[in-house]
């Protein structure tokens, strides 16, 4: 028999794998999958981190998400309706350059550690 379909309500999300500057909330975890929501306050910048062997897909619901990552000078920016792919082991940080909270839906594929906080990588990574 198959598993039942489940709905996780917004008020049922659980705090998950903290990184300074952002609030991750877990909706559910299944073998090879992590799904949740990420909120970054206006003007906030996260700490540097990566997602181990997990591939991450982000969907921007509201606000702006700016991502800096190891080995690249400058940043990429995503807006509502945009998708972002963060490859496994990619050291990065998010920021929100606007005056409104950004909201992102995350789906991660893999069974690694969800978030590994790390020290700032060597240059280049800033504009």
Give the residues covered by each predicted segment.
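Ligand-binding loop in jelly-roll beta-barrel domains
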Residues: 79-80, 88-114
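A generic "binding-loop/recognition-motif" signal
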Residues: 44, 53-54, 72, 90-91, ...
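A short beta-strand-loop-beta hairpin characteristic of the jelly-roll/cupin
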Residues: 57-80
């Amino acid at each position: 028999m198959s598993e039942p379909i489940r709905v996780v309500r917004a008020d049922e999300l659980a705090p998950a794998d903290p990184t300074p500057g952002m609030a991750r909330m877990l909706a559910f975890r299944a073998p090879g999958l992590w799904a949740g929501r990420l909120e970054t306050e206006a003007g906030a910048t996260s700490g540097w981190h990566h997602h181990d062997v997990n591939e991450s897909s982000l969907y921007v619901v509201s606000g702006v998400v700016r991502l800096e990552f190891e080995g690249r000078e400058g940043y990429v920016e995503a807006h509502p309706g945009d998708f972002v792919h963060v490859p496994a082991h990619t050291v990065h940080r998010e920021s929100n350059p606007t005056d409104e909270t950004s909201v992102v839906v995350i789906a991660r594929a893999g069974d690694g550690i969800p978030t590994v906080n790390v020290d700032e990588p060597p240059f280049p990574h800033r504009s």
